[in-house]
Curated annotation (Swiss-Prot):
KW Mitochondrion (keyword) present: no
Protein name: Putative ankyrin repeat protein FPV014
Phylogenetic lineage: Viruses, Varidnaviria, Bamfordvirae, Nucleocytoviricota, Pokkesviricetes
ANK repeat extents: 32-61, 65-94, 99-128, 131-160, 164-195, 197-226, 230-259
Pfam families: Ank (PF00023), Ank_2 (PF12796), PRANC (PF09372)
InterPro entries linked: Ankyrin_rpt, Ankyrin_rpt-contain_sf, PRANC_domain
SMART domains for this protein: ANK (SM00248)
Keyword Repeat attached: yes
Length: 437
C-alpha cells in the first residue's frame, strides 16, 4: 500500500512515483473501505486529488462504510476539492450508502452557506422527491434564512412536509427566527397548514412564545380559532401558558373565548394566583363583554360561555371587572358623534372606515380606560382613510385641472363638482383602487 502511505505523507512526487512504479489501480481501497481519492480528500490535498482524478480515479466511488469523495469534502469543508470534483463531473446528488443523504443535505445540516451555494451552482437538486426529509426543512429548523433563500431560488418547495407532517413554516417558527418566518410567508408559505397532531402554524407560534410571529401569521390570514387534536385553540394555549402579549394579539383579531377543550376554556385555565394570569382573565372578560355588541360575532360554544359567566360571578374581582366593562360599553353607546349622531360604540365595531373618517375630529379616548386601545385603533383607521381620500382628491384635481386658455363649452367635469360630492364618489372606491400617483 505504498500509494496510501505516499498520500498520507502529502508528497506529490512520491504519489506520482507510487502510482507509476507499481502500475497501481487508482480505484483501489484499503482495509477500511477508503479509496485513494478518499484519503486525498481526508487530508485536504487538492493537488493529489487532481492527480488521482487524472489517473482515472472514480469521483463517485463509495463503499458500504465510506460515502463518496464529495460527501467527505462537503463534511470537511474542503471547498477547493468540491470545485475540483465538480470539474470532473461528479454526481452532486449521489446518495451515500449508509446514511442516504446527499452532499447538499450535509451542507445544509452544517449551516454552510458557501458550500450550499457551491453545490446549487453546480446543479445539486434542491427538491428531490425521494428524500425522507427536505433540505429546506433542515435549513428552516436551523433558522438559517440565507440557506432557505438559496434553496427556494433553486426550486425547493416552500410548503414541504417532513416526518409528522411538519411543514417548512413550522420548522421556521420552532427555530425562533422571526425574519425567516416573514420571508417564508412573503414567498407563499401557507399560514394555516397543520401537522399530524392538528397543530397549526399559529399553535406553534404560541408555543414558541412569540407575539410577533402570532401577529404576522394572523396578518397573512391564519385562522385565529383553529383547534388542535384536543380541541385547544391558540388562545387556550396562550392563556394556559400565561402569555399575556400573545393573548392580547389574539383577542385583537377577535379570537373566540368560548372554544373549549373538554370543559376547560381560556378563562378557566388562567392562573389567578399570578398578576399575569389575572390580567389575562381581565382581557378575556373585556372581550366577552364587547363581543356581544359586534354584529358579525358569533359565539361558537354557548354552553362554554355560560360556564365562563358562572366563573366570573363566583369571583368578586372578575365580577367587578365585568361590571366595569359593561359600564364603559354603555358610556361608548351613549357617546354620539358627527352629523349622523353615530354612537362611539357603533363606530368602533360596526362602521366602515368612511364613516369613521367623517367623525374623526369628534372621536376621543378621553374618559375611557378599558376600551381605550379599541378607540385608538378606530381613530387610526379613520386617519388612514382620511389621508387616502385627501391624496386621491389631490390627484383627481390635478388630472382634471381646466386649461384657462380653452373656451368653456358648457360641459361639466370633475372640477365643477361640489367638494362633498367628490368625497362621496371617492368613498365608494376601495383603498387599493384609489387614484394614487
Amino acid at each position: 500500500m505504498e500509494v496510501f502511505e505516499a498520500i498520507e505523507s502529502g508528497c506529490v512526487s512520491d504519489v506520482i512515483k507510487a502510482l507509476k512504479g507499481n502500475d497501481s489501480d487508482p480505484n483501489m481501497v484499503n482495509e477500511y473501505g477508503c479509496s485513494l481519492l478518499h484519503c486525498a480528500v481526508e487530508n485536504g490535498n487538492t493537488e493529489i486529488a487532481r492527480i488521482l482524478l487524472l489517473e482515472g480515479a472514480n469521483p463517485d466511488l463509495y463503499t458500504e462504510s465510506t460515502p463518496t469523495a464529495l460527501h467527505r469534502a462537503v463534511i470537511l469543508r474542503h471547498y477547493d476539492i468540491v470545485n475540483l470534483l465538480m470539474e470532473f463531473n461528479v454526481d452532486p446528488d449521489n446518495y451515500e450508502n449508509h446514511e442516504s443523504r446527499t452532499p447538499l443535505e450535509y451542507a445544509v445540516k452544517l449551516n454552510d452557506v458557501k458550500m450550499t451555494k457551491t453545490l446549487l451552482d453546480y446543479g445539486a437538486d434542491a427538491e428531490d422527491i425521494y428524500r425522507f426529509n427536505c433540505p429546506i426543512n433542515d435549513a428552516a429548523a436551523n433558522g438559517n434564512l440565507e440557506i432557505c433563500k438559496l434553496l427556494i431560488d433553486a426550486g425547493a418547495r416552500i410548503n414541504s412536509r417532513s416526518m409528522g407532517s411538519v411543514y417548512t413554516i413550522h420548522h421556521a417558527i420552532r427555530s425562533g427566527n422571526y425574519e425567516l418566518v416573514v420571508e417564508l410567508l412573503s414567498r407563499g408559505a401557507l399560514p394555516d397548514v397543520e401537522d399530524e397532531l392538528s397543530f397549526s402554524s399559529l399553535h406553534h407560534a404560541v408555543m414558541e412564545g412569540s407575539a410577533d410571529m402570532v401577529l404576522t401569521l394572523l396578518e397573512h390570514g391564519a385562522s385565529v380559532d383553529v383547534q388542535d387534536f384536543c380541541g385547544r385553540t391558540p388562545l387556550f394555549l396562550a392563556a394556559n401558558a400565561s402569555e399575556l402579549d400573545i393573548v392580547k394579539v389574539l383577542l385583537d383579531f377577535w379570537a373566540d373565548t368560548s372554544v373549549s377543550s373538554g370543559r376547560n376554556t381560556p378563562l378557566s385555565v388562567c392562573d389567578l394566583n399570578s398578576d399575569t394570569g389575572i390580567e389575562i382573565a381581565k382581557q378575556i372578560i373585556s372581550t366577552m363583554v364587547i363581543n356581544t355588541e359586534y354584529k358579525y360575532h358569533k359565539v361558537i360554544n354557548e354552553e362554554a360561555r355560560r360556564n365562563d359567566l358562572e366563573i366570573i360571578e363566583s369571583n368578586n374581582e372578575m365580577k367587578d371587572w365585568k361590571d366595569s366593562c359593561i359600564e364603559e360599553v354603555e358610556k361608548m353607546r351613549k357617546t354620539t358623534l358627527g352629523s349622523d349622531r353615530r354612537s362611539l360604540l357603533d363606530l368602533c365595531l360596526n362602521c366602515d372606515d368612511n364613516a369613521i373618517a367623517k367623525c374623526l375630529n369628534c372621536i376621543s379616548c378621553e374618559g375611557f380606560f378599558i376600551y381605550r386601545q379599541l378607540i385608538e385603533y378606530t381613530i387610526e383607521r379613520g386617519l388612514l382613510r382620511h389621508e387616502s381620500l385627501d391624496k386621491a382628491l389631490d390627484v383627481m384635481e390635478k388630472a382634471f385641472e381646466k386649461n384657462r386658455n380653452v373656451k368653456d363649452n358648457g360641459l361639466k367635469d370633475w372640477s365643477d363638482l361640489p367638494l362633498g360630492i367628490k368625497y362621496d364618489i371617492l368613498e365608494k372606491i376601495d383603498e387599493e383602487d384609489l387614484p394614487y400617483c
